[in-house]
Amino acid sequence: CLMEFCFAPGTPSGFALQVLHHWQLRYQIDGFHLVGDASLAEEASKDALLRKTKLIFLGFDGARIYQGKRPWFRNLGEHNQGYQYHIRRFLKGDEGSLSDFTYYLRRSPETHGVINYLADHDGFTLYDSVSYEQKHNLDNGEDNMDGSNENLTWNCGAEGVTRKPAVRALRLRQLKNAVLMLMTSQGTPLIYGGDEFGNSQKGNNNAWCQDNKTGWIDWKAAARNPEFAAFVKAAIAFRKAHPALHGEREPRLIDYKSYGCPDMSFHSQRAWFSQMENT
């Protein structure tokens, strides 16, 4: 079980650590997702009571905290927002996104773990990211002013619910592309609950206040989307069966073990040349 806490910048680190100690000792919490003040990461990483507790932050300088050395137990994790940003750009075909895609596909720092995701509780669901280009948050009561305006989404030709076979087929293909990219990336993949079978919030990207069908997971959607649900299961099984997709070290893109080929390489139309410019 992971608990999410927000400690605003300026919160005394001693107080924040006391809060974490209470939840860890009293309720045996496995870890914490901590947002707000990322400077707490260094203090928490040195805390004896939290040495085996998973501590996930939005961002921090792991190289500085550990001085470039691999810790004996990697309990710090990065909620990899950069992954979501750049992989979504590549998924919808944005110009100049290929180089960033290849970087985030193989990124796995020595000092800490990275949690890769394409959707989480803050923003569009995965299905909505291929079905909506605009947020639809009027029901939240804030005149559609809440929620992010930069969602990096593409509706595949129609906004929201549609009966057009071509649009629906393209959305399914994009969902499969997204899951396959996630499952072939180094690091730890995170699938937001319901995304494994195409759950939708009808374009609401800030549904925390919707205690109704908008914010709930529609478990019946699994029966309506059996092809995609089966694909997700197969992609997870494929990842588990191939250790190269979740190695202990970040690929270097060179043949440093003298096997006759690099540990990872990228190719385009010409096998001998990797073109990193997509237009």
Where are these predicted regions, by residue range?
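Substrate-binding/active-site clefts of carbohydrate-active enzymes
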Residues: 1-27, 40-44, 49
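The substrate-binding groove and active-site-proximal loops of carbohydrate-active enzymes
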Residues: 2-14, 28-35, 87-90, 157-171, ...
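Alpha-helical packing segments of well-folded alpha/beta enzyme cores
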Residues: 12, 16-23, 171-182, 186, ...
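Conserved alpha/beta catalytic core and glycan-binding cleft of carbohydrate-active enzymes
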Residues: 28, 40-193, 197-198, 206-210, ...
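Extended hydrophobic/aromatic segments used for targeting, binding, or gating
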Residues: 201-233, 237
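Catalytic cores of secreted or luminal carbohydrate-active enzymes
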Residues: 223-265
